């Protein structure tokens, strides 16, 4: 058999120049590896929703990464059927490029969309290409918990079929947390601990000091306490608890709420704000660049939330942005989850149970009334990021893992 020409192919729906974390994290990894002795390519979707660069070429090389983009049907993701069409459309379009995999020694594939791993499974069978799997979310369990999938239906059976072959044939799995690693070991019995490495996500935000321009940009007064939520408002996020806490505090002029992002709960959040008359809540679309930097800078604390039943199946990427930004964290999460434990044990904020609006309100007021302590929480959050989640830590782990898998 002819020796393979290249080392690593990234297979993911989102990639450079898109600005969502599902694009920036793989691109960060790809360019780091390309600059550290690996030959790297990427097969990804043509950018649309998260792109501000205008038209981009179907093929180009960026920072040593050879990128090929695929056009596919991309519908509005608010409806479940549209999201399914997007998933299968991209996967089918990528499958039509299966010949490309023959050139690579390994493929790294991501869990979004969850049907995508079928392609490297096929590539391994026909070309002997090794593959690695990055588990951003664990399917189908995350879909069960968020009530977007019923056990036994067609999509569920498809996912289970893919999973059976995925975990049997994968060379290595990357979990985002040790909690997720344990979930995989408990529920994917063909996996062993030596085939799973925990590599947390990282962030791009730096700690910025807010200025008058930043406050005025978002309509706040200097000194107001701003509780911010950034990121996805999807099936996995509990937005109700935050909205209810904002409703309780709507007459407290010291506290303002800023909700920024996208997702299939975005319209419900918008409707709740309007129907409840929450003039203390400002909702904005996905921000990036200077707008996002200033929004983070004026935040006094930041909220991370997950619905019940998701322990071990996912990890919110914005949590790491909050830490790197040096912000105290309010976690609306299950009490025995890794997020709750870390927030409490590292003293970087407060964790409250999903649905407990009164405890969330109390935690916010505690931060408002003891701002020096809140600032100290933020300083501890930044220390935690630098010592546990920093970009360089993750990249060194990826480099060592690929060196081992490829016997380099």
What residues fall within each predicted segment?
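A short, well-ordered alpha-helix in the C-terminal region of glycosyltransferases
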Residues: 359, 366, 373-387
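A short helix/loop element that forms part of the nucleotide-sugar donor recognition site in Leloir-type
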Residues: 55-59, 204, 208-221
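Conserved donor-binding/catalytic core segment of Leloir-type glycosyltransferases
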Residues: 203, 220-237, 243-246, 258
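Nucleotide-activated donor-binding/catalytic signature segment of Leloir-type glycosyltransferases, i.e.
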Residues: 260-261, 266-293
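Nucleotide-sugar-dependent
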Residues: 237, 288-295, 300-323, 328-341
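N-terminal subdomain of nucleotide-sugar transferases
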Residues: 1-66
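Membrane-proximal helix-turn-helix segments that form the acceptor-binding/catalytic region
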Residues: 118, 122-127, 153-173
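Carbohydrate-associated surface elements
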Residues: 46, 179, 199-202
């Amino acid at each position: 058999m002819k020796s393979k020409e290249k080392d690593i192919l990234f297979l993911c729906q989102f990639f450079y120049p898109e600005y969502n974390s599902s694009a920036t994290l793989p691109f960060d990894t790809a360019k780091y590896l390309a600059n550290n002795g690996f030959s790297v390519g990427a097969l990804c979707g043509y950018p649309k929703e998260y792109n501000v660069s205008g038209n981009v070429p179907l093929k180009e090389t960026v920072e040593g990464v050879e990128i090929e983009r695929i056009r596919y049907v991309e519908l509005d993701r608010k409806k479940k059927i549209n999201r399914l069409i997007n998933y299968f459309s991209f996967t089918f379009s990528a499958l039509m490029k299966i010949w490309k995999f023959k050139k690579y020694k390994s493929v790294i594939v991501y869990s979004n969309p969850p049907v995508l791993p079928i392609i490297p499974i096929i590539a391994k069978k026909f070309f002997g290409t090794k593959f690695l799997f990055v588990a951003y979310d664990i399917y189908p369990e995350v879909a069960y918990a968020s009530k977007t999938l019923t056990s036994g239906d067609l999509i569920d059976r498809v996912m289970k079929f893919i999973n059976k072959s995925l975990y049997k044939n994968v060379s290595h799995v990357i979990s985002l947390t040790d909690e997720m690693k344990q979930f995989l070991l408990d529920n994917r019995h063909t996996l062993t601990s030596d085939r799973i490495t925990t590599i947390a996500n990282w962030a791009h935000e730096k700690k910025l000091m807010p200025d008058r321009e930043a406050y005025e940009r978002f309509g706040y007064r200097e000194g107001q306490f701003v509780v911010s939520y950034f990121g996805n408002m999807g099936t996995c996020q509990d937005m109700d608890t935050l909205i209810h806490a904002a409703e309780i505090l709507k007459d407290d002029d010291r506290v303002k709420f800023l909700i920024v992002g996208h997702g299939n709960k975005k319209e419900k959040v918008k409707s709740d704000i309007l129907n409840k008359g929450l003039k203390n809540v400002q909702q904005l679309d996905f921000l990036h660049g200077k707008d996002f930097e200033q929004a983070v800078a004026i935040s006094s604390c930041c909220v991370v939330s997950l619905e019940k039943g998701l322990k071990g199946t996912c990890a919110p990427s914005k949590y790491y942005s909050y830490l790197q930004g040096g912000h105290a964290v309010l976690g609306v999460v299950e009490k025995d989850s890794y997020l709750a434990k870390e927030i409490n044990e590292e003293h970087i904020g407060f964790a409250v149970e999903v649905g407990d609006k009164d405890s969330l309100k109390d935690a916010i007021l505690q931060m408002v009334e003891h701002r020096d302590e809140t600032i100290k929480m933020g300083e501890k959050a930044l220390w935690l990021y630098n010592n546990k989640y920093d970009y360089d830590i993750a990249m060194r782990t990826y480099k060592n893992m690929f060196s081992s898998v490829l016997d380099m």
